[in-house]
Amino acid sequence: MRPLDDSPLARDGKVLILAYDHGLEHGPVDFEPRPATMDPETVFETATHDAVTATAVQKGVAEAFYPSYEDDVTLLAKVNGTSNLWMGEHDSAVNWSVDYAKELGADAIGF
């Protein structure tokens, strides 16, 4: 394991990840208390705050919004996902490759 200070997710020895990868897994019910957080643009704007060191998103959100923020936001690419829309075993399928995440500009990978 490499030291935290060598991680692209750390700043001054601290990490604060803005996790926006749960919408796929939990559905829109997670956003009901704060509807503005349903908008990825709002989340990426929030991610530009100095306290936020990275933003975790799924493939589609990264493709659509990260290019406009690549100079201001550290991307943690969540390469797998599941859903609570079915009962039984949750398959956490890989939905994009590490190589593609890197090509898009990801600084780190989440699984």
Regions found by a protein language model. Name each.
Residues 1-12, 16:
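N-terminal basic/disordered segments at the start of proteins
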Residues 15-17, 21-55, 60-111:
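Alpha/beta enzyme core
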